[in-house]
C-alpha cells in the first residue's frame, strides 16, 4: 500500500460550506455532547458536530439542518467531545513496534496525532531507514508526522553508529510529504559552540519553514543555554524541574513535559503553571519513550493527561497541552488540535474529564476505536531484508570478552560507576571500591549494588566490547540482561552479575537478530524478538506487549525493583545526557564530553 495524503481544507471547502449552511448533508453528526473548546477553554453542553470529507463542517447547539438520510448519527448523550490527543515528542521505536502496530496500540487510547523522531532507526539504517518509517507512518488512519533525525551520531567522536546523518540528508528529507521538522538536536554542545554541521542542519530546516526540535540535557541555564536557544531549537523535553520549564518558556521555547514508561518529569515541572501561574500556552505534554507493555496496559497520551490532572492541573488546561498547544507549535493549528470548522475531524468521546475513559475515537471523520478496541486496519509497510539481520558481532562471545583486568599487583581498585536514577534519564557519576581476584575486577555481592555493563559493537562486526560498571538495578544471583535497543547508537548493551551469563545473553541476540533477553543460571527467562533493525517487531502489539511484560517480570525476579528498569537499561549508552554513559569508545563523562578512565588509583 502506498502512502496517502489527506485532502486539504482548501480541497474540500466547497463541501464544508454547503454542509454548514444546510444545503448538503453531513457524512456524520455527533449529537448532543459537551463541546470542549480548547480555543476558549470552555465546556459547552448541548452541542453537536457535523463532519464531511473527514473534516469538521459545523459545531453548534443544533446540527439538524446538516442531517440527511445517509448521515451517520452518533449520540454523545452529554459526554465530553474533546479533540484527538497529540503526542508532541516521541520515538515509535521505543514501543518496540513498527508505526502500524504502534498506531494500533495507541488509537484506542485516543491518540490521533503523533510527532515522531525516528532517530533510533537512523543510527542503524541511515536515511533509508528513516524513509521506511516515514512511508509506513503516512499509510496509517491517524496523523503521524515525522521529524528528520538530526544527530546520528548523537555526539561525534564519542561513539560510532551504523550510519551518519548529514546536512544533505536533512535537506533532502525536508522535501518529503510527511516531514514536519528536525528531530531533537541532541548535540547541544555542538550548537552552543556553533558547529557548522549542526547549524547547517538547523538552517536547512528553518529555510524549509519547519520546526527545529530541541534537547538541552544540561543543568547550566546560563550563557550556554542562551547560545543553544539562539541556535534555533524551538522546544525541549529534557527539563526535570520547575526552573528548567520556566527557563525554557521565558526564552521563547516550548516546554515539553514528558511522562514515558520511565520518565516522570511532569509533576516536577507543571508547578510552573499550577503554582507560579505562568501562561500555559507554551507548555506541551509528551511521552518521549513508551514501551509496548505501557501502551497496551496503561495507555498513551490519555495516561499523560490524567497524570497532569492528578498533579493539580486544571483538566481543560491539561487537554490544551495535549491538543491545541502541540498543533500550534508545529504550525498546524488550522489543521488539527481542536474541534472547530475546517479542522480534521479527530474527536474523542469521554464521560469523565479527570479519569478520561476513552469511549469512542474518531479520526479524519471515521470511527477508529470504540471501548478500547481498534476498529480499523493499520496497514503494514513491506520491510525489506536490509532492515533485518542487523546484529553483527564478528565472533561468538565468551566470558573472557567481559573480563576487566586490574592493575598488576592490585588487590582492590577504585572504579568510576554509572549510577542509575529511578524515573529519570540522567545518571549519577559514582565511585566504588571493588575487589580483585586472580587479576580481574569483580562485582559479585558488592554492598553498593554494583554490577557490570558492556557495550558490544554490532554494526560493523568489529568484535569490540567495552566494559564498565553500573549501579542501581539491584540484580542478584548469576544473571544478565542484553538489549540491541541502546540509545542512540544502538549497539548492544549487556548488564549482568556474571560474565558467562553476559556471553549467553549477547550470543542469543545475535542468533535471533536483535531484541531483549534475560538469563539466569544458564536459562533464558524472557525474550522479546525485535527483528527490524534490532529495534522493532512487526508482530501484533498485544503479542509484543505480553513479551515485554514477561521481560519486566524477569527483571524483577532477578532482584530489580526499579520502575520500568528496561528504559533505564536502554539509555545507558546515550552520551548526550549527563552524567556518565558507556559507548563503544569507552566510558564517557557527559558533563565534560570526554572519555575517562574506568579505574583510578586508590589513594
From Swiss-Prot:
Pfam families, per database record: Adenine_deam_C, Amidohydro_1
GO biological process: adenine catabolic process
Catalyzed reactions per annotation: adenine + H2O + H(+) = hypoxanthine + NH4(+)
First-level EC class: hydrolase
UniProt-listed SUPFAM superfamilies: Composite domain of metallo-dependent hydrolases, Metallo-dependent hydrolases
GO molecular function: adenine deaminase activity
Enzyme Commission number(s): 3.5.4.2
Record key words, sorted: Hydrolase, Manganese
Cofactor: Mn(2+)
Signal peptide: none
HAMAP family, A to Z: Adenine_deamin
PANTHER family: ADENINE DEAMINASE, N-ACETYLGLUCOSAMINE-6-PHOSPHATE DEACETYLASE
NCBIfam families hit by this protein: ade
Family: Belongs to the metallo-dependent hydrolases superfamily. Adenine deaminase family.
Protein name: Adenine deaminase
Organism whose genome encodes this protein: Ruegeria pomeroyi (strain ATCC 700808 / DSM 15171 / DSS-3)
